[in-house]
């Protein structure tokens, strides 16, 4: 990715609006929406400076276009910028180890790859977020309508005796399911919410 000149960039977003290449699935929204070839990775990114995805940018692929450079009044676009390693000194750091999302390809019984309306908890999180692909509105991905029935299936991939998952409890499913269920019941009181689980450890 080619980072723009962050000292010049004002974060106005015009480059993203005018970019003609808008068919790349958004990584942050888990592929539920598309982004442009020049984009801010997520709404709270620091610095709030867009980056250029070389693989999907028409300028890098064909040598033509350059729309983002033409519309940038601050002159912040730098197509010649190279990757570099920057060393900084800080008084403290936060180590966040993160996690890997379970691959649902091995769980055909849930029809995740067959039905647009079977989603993961992280995809639901993005849908329910006001800055997400549906602006916080709970919608079925198949038809855009609000669901009348919603089912959470807990413990998928946790406490598995086979090699598809992990033998231990993830320790987070219960908490975020309770959060999502309460948010949905509060915002959509006519929606029935059902939770299937092995054990509740909240």
Region locations from a protein language model:
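Glycine-/small-residue-rich beta->alpha transition segments that form the dinucleotide
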Residues: 14, 90-92, 96-103, 156
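Hydrophobic anchor at the start of a short beta-strand
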Residues: 93, 181, 193
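Long hydrophobic segments that form regular secondary structure
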Residues: 69-72, 76-77, 152, 180-190
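Glycine-rich dinucleotide-binding loop and its adjacent helix/turn
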Residues: 32-55, 100-186
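Short internal beta-strands
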Residues: 192-199
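Conserved small/polar residues in nucleotide/adenosyl-binding loops
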Residues: 1-3
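Iron-sulfur cluster-binding cysteine motifs and their immediate structural context
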Residues: 14-43, 58-88, 106
